């Protein structure tokens, strides 16, 4: 897209239209102190040469850390290996856009790729239909909650406190402006959703119950079937947030009779990025297809008998009837969805299972080493987990992690970032990118920090 700055004449016309004499007057409501500070912070040299500008950016980028650090960060964004082929296909000029086409049948290549993505998500989750993707998991959770309200006609949503706190924050933002009640369930002593609390809280007024498996603290929910029975007994919808890679070894959501599956697709071949772009997964039962937000690509046969692909059921969408649309999802993450499709097709079921097994085994190897070598205390020692767990620290977790950072280790997420009362707890994640050597170095470094003999 070309960039053409406003001409002096255009600026004058705009100022005249709003009845302002100058740009200075336009911003006069902002205190001079703040304006001056902004000028200092964003001051640029006059028309730098390209080489000077690149050098300046290079110097600024040195403030970032990451490439030379061993990472044990998780909490919804994971450092998985991305095969070169995924990057190659994703950068094809025909795919290199975030847009799904508006015209029902234009861009057959893009439409087929999105159709394959939808099919692969259905294979992974066991669900019947999937959409063409959403922005990320947070908005996906919110859209699923709104789906439950539309389908049931009820305006009360229950969510487990085991759901990623950032997703809960997004959910609150969506629901509060639509006057939908949100109730949050506590966890039990093992870090699982308290089923007794669910029994007390759920009612005929509940539209949907949202759980996450594995949950934010890495704990695997073992009572999903019992909770599913309880949810459907009250004519509510069962919504489950997933970690896609974990489905390589965990049962698919369909086996728990889940109504709507949502999740963060970043682990499926999408690079880590501060702010994205990531990928919101949403899949559901066929009976709810007309309430799905966003695009849906379908397969059809044209007049000449050839297989083709189209945007289907478009009357649900905001560009057809904005006031009655199921959502305002428009420019979705189609490029991220295509990357995920290439990743899943390349690895296949066996490949995803293998990655899940490696994540599982190395995380358990680390926990075992921490327990036996260092006597580390765990927050949920008796719970099952996939590739994340929470440890206790002898001092403030941020101070503790800073000491590991000095040894070029990103040791985990301080839970005090989300929960003030958990200032001595760290969430640790392990993926296939963490070699046994890295794990051993982590244990060795922890020993030094703890000053263990």
Swiss-Prot record:
Family: Belongs to the GcvP family. N-terminal subunit subfamily.
Complexes and interactors: The glycine cleavage system is composed of four proteins: P, T, L and H. In this organism, the P 'protein' is a heterodimer of two subunits.
Keywords: Oxidoreductase
One Gene Ontology term from the biological process aspect of the record: nucleoside metabolic process
InterPro entries the record matches: GcvPA, GDC-P_N, GDC_P, PyrdxlP-dep_Trfase, PyrdxlP-dep_Trfase_major, PyrdxlP-dep_Trfase_small
Recorded catalytic activity of this chain's protein: N(6)-[(R)-lipoyl]-L-lysyl-[glycine-cleavage complex H protein] + glycine + H(+) = N(6)-[(R)-S(8)-aminomethyldihydrolipoyl]-L-lysyl-[glycine-cleavage complex H protein] + CO2
Name used for this protein in its record: Probable glycine dehydrogenase (decarboxylating) subunit 1
Entry annotated with the keyword Oxidoreductase: yes
Gene3D superfamilies noted in UniProt: Aspartate Aminotransferase, domain 1, Type I PLP-dependent aspartate aminotransferase-like (Major domain)
Organism: Dictyoglomus turgidum (strain DSM 6724 / Z-1310)
UniProt entry tagged with the keyword Transcription regulation: no
Protein task: The glycine cleavage system catalyzes the degradation of glycine. The P protein binds the alpha-amino group of glycine through its pyridoxal phosphate cofactor; CO(2) is released and the remaining methylamine moiety is then transferred to the lipoamide cofactor of the H protein.
């Amino acid at each position: 897209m070309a960039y053409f700055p406003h001409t002096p004449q255009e600026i004058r016309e705009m100022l005249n239209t709003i009845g302002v004499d100058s740009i200075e007057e336009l911003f006069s409501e902002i205190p001079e102190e703040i304006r001056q500070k902004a000028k200092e912070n964003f001051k640029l040299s006059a028309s730098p040469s390209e080489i000077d500008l690149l050098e300046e950016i290079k110097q600024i980028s040195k403030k970032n850390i990451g490439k030379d650090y061993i990472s044990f960060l998780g909490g919804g964004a994971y450092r998985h290996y991305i095969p070169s082929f995924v990057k190659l296909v994703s950068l094809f000029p025909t795919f290199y856009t975030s847009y799904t086409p508006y015209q029902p049948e234009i861009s057959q290549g893009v439409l087929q790729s999105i159709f394959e993505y939808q099919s692969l998500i259905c294979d992974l989750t066991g669900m019947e239909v999937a959409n063409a993707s959403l922005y990320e998991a947070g908005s996906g959770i919110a859209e699923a909650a709104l789906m439950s309200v539309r389908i049931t006609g009820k305006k009360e949503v229950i969510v487990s406190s085991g759901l990623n706190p950032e997703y809960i924050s997004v959910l609150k933002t969506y629901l509060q402006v639509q006057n939908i009640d949100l109730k949050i369930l506590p966890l039990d002593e093992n870090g699982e959703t308290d089923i007794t609390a669910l029994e007390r809280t759920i009612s005929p007024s509940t539209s949907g119950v949202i759980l996450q498996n594995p949950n934010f603290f890495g704990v695997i929910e073992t009572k999903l079937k019992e909770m599913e029975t309880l949810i459907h007994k009250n004519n509510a919808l069962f919504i489950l947030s997933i970690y896609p890679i974990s489905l390589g070894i965990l049962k698919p959501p369909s086996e728990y009779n889940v109504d709507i599956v949502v999740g963060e697709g970043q682990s499926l071949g999408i690079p880590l990025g501060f702010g994205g772009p990531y990928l919101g997964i949403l899949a559901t039962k066929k009976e709810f297809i007309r309430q799905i937000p966003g695009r849906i690509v379908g397969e059809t046969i044209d007049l000449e008998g050839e297989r083709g692909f189209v945007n289907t059921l478009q009357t649900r969408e905001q560009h057809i009837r904005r006031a009655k649309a199921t959502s305002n999802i428009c420019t979705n993450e189609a490029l991220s969805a295509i990357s995920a499709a290439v990743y899943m097709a390349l690895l296949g079921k066996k490949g995803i299972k293998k990655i899940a097994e490696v994540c599982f085994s190395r995380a358990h190897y680390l926990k075992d080493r921490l327990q036996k070598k260092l006597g580390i205390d765990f927050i949920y020692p008796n719970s099952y987990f996939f590739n994340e767990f929470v440890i206790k620290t002898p001092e403030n977790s941020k101070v503790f992690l800073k000491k590991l950072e000095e040894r070029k280790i990103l040791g985990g997420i301080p839970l005090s970032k989300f929960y003030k009362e958990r200032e001595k707890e760290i969430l640790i994640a392990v993926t296939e990118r963490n070699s046994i050597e890295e794990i051993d170095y982590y244990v060795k470094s922890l020993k030094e920090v703890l000053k263990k003999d």
